[in-house]
Amino acid sequence: MKKINLQTRRMVNAKADPNYEGFQTNLLFGLDELCEKFIDKNSTILEIGCYNGISTSLFCYYAKEVDGVDIKISKKLFDLRNQVDNLTLYEQASRTYLKEAISQNKKYDLIYLDGNHSYNAVKNEILLAQQLLKPNGILSGHDMVEGNKRRNNGVLKAVYEVYPEIEKGDIRLYRFSDSSWAIKHL
């Protein structure tokens, strides 16, 4: 299997958007933490919201198979797909893909939500994505930030509402330095 190598991974991230180099460095560090903790060479991953492929490139490096879903597939994402053989891209709305995947009984080891960050979108994606997880699968996502009323607080609200067990301590919420989060399903 052709895998993206470290040099290619760095190149993809450096080319993704040179104006956000500092952000990408932080993003890569947090995603590396998440990947090292939860992904192995046999993992199957679904990523909702791929944008320019920064996180997608890391998932391809760590996992056996990656399905990427985005409403608009960028040229950079198509370029990444040509560098690896473990990436399948779907250009459609997340809700549409999730419902189709459920009807096809697809299952994933890890699902990463990074599309629409509004409360309703995140909540609906979580409820659908739960049905696609393998036993002991990981539901995760990006942009769980606190104290920012203008940006992405829909993620925080939706996660805590769907998983009230977090506040009781019955479910562990993993947090990473790039604002990624993860919950292990039993």
Region roles according to the model:
Residues 1-112, 116-186:
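A short alpha-helical cap/connector motif
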